[in-house]
């Protein structure tokens, strides 16, 4: 979905994203570190790598494919990916239309992503499609969503249900 409204939005903010989001990223770092510590030795997909700020939190020696809808965000992530002690392949891709074959990945990780996916159910179906049988989807979300089922899941989580 090259040229989509979502892609244009992230391209526009790529140059100042770190400045605008730094405090929040520091606040969420303990939870993200815990999430990323679950990265196994298999084939891993990281959805919405952005400018690559989270790469420094990844365990070493992993094989990761990291995608983002924004070419400008990916450009910013390149230097961090090069410095990673493992393998990171950066690709431009929309979560709603993944170009991977079915049952490709052992694990999929997302961090603060689905609040920005215009059709989150479609995106989740794509993640399910590309996960191997028994594969894991691990997510960190930071905000309320107006999309079903995230709205209900996040409400239940906040209220202990």
Annotate each language-model stretch with its function.
Residues 4, 20-24, 138-161:
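C-terminal alpha-helical "lid/dimerization" subdomain adjacent to the S-adenosyl-L-methionine
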Residues 121-136:
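A short glycine-rich, Lys/Arg-flanked "PGG" loop and its adjoining helix->strand segment in the class I
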Residues 43, 63, 134-136:
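Short glycine-centered segments of the SAM/dcSAM-binding site in methyltransferase folds
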Residues 107-119:
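A short SAM/SAH-binding and catalytic strip from SAM-dependent methyltransferases
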Residues 23-42, 53:
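Conserved alpha-helix/loop element of class I SAM-dependent methyltransferases that forms part
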Residues 1-15:
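N-terminal, positively charged/glycine-rich alpha-helical extensions of SAM-dependent methyltransferases
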Residues 96-108:
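A short acidic, Gly/Pro-enriched loop at the edge of an enzyme's catalytic core
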Residues 45-97:
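Class I SAM-dependent methyltransferase SAM/SAH-binding core
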């Amino acid at each position: 979905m090259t040229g989509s409204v979502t892609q244009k939005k992230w391209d526009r903010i790529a140059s100042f994203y770190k400045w605008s989001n730094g405090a929040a990223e520091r606040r969420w770092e303990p939870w993200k570190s815990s999430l990323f510590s679950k990265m196994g030795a298999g084939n891993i997909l990281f959805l919405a790598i952005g400018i690559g700020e989270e790469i420094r939190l990844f365990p070493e020696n992993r094989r990761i494919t990291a995608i983002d809808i924004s070419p400008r965000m990916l450009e910013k992530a390149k230097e961090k990916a090069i410095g990673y002690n493992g393998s990171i392949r950066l690709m431009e891709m929309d979560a709603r239309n993944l170009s991977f074959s079915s049952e490709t990945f052992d694990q999929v990780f997302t961090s603060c992503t689905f609040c920005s996916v215009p059709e989150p159910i479609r995106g989740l179906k794509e993640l399910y499609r590309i996960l191997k049988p028994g594969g894991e989807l691990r997510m960190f979300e930071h905000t309320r969503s107006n999309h079903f089922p995230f709205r209900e899941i996040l409400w239940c989580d906040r209220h202990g249900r």
